[in-house]
Amino acid sequence: MTKAGLHRSILQELVKNGEIYRFGRGLYVRSSAWEDDFYLLQRKYGRGIYSHDTALYLLGYSDRTPAKYTMTFPKGYNALSLKQENLTVKRVVPENYDFGTIEIEFPSGNPIRVYDLERTLCDILRGSGSDVQVVGEAMKRYAASKDKNIHKLMKCADQLRVKPKVLRYMEVLP
């Protein structure tokens, strides 16, 4: 904030008056503003990328609002405050971290980094813990979508080593 020409004492006064509140280190939010948790968490944890069930929701392939957001970080990233958040934390090897990252605009107008649909489908098939019904519905929607990119899905499945699982799902879908 000092870079923006705002002195710390002014920030403290605004917090004291209830006009803003501190969300995290260097992050302040107007008390009257709509709180965009997705954006704020990503600003707080800049290395986090929304993934798994949360990415499905953000991309419009799941109707279930996640009870806990899922973010993926590179292996070795260790922010102690992550444990205090309502987050499921996933870690991946550095060579797979940026693979399939896109930026979408949230309804609030804020940019959100999320894994693309093909990467997300592979991630949820790869791990455990995803609701079978959510996975099945997402795969059905993908198979019926005019925007599906099977070549990209298979390339992603190869890189993340889930090609047999992806093929099994794709074989049984119309």
Model-derived features: where do they sit?
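Short amphipathic alpha-helical interaction segments
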Residues: 3-16
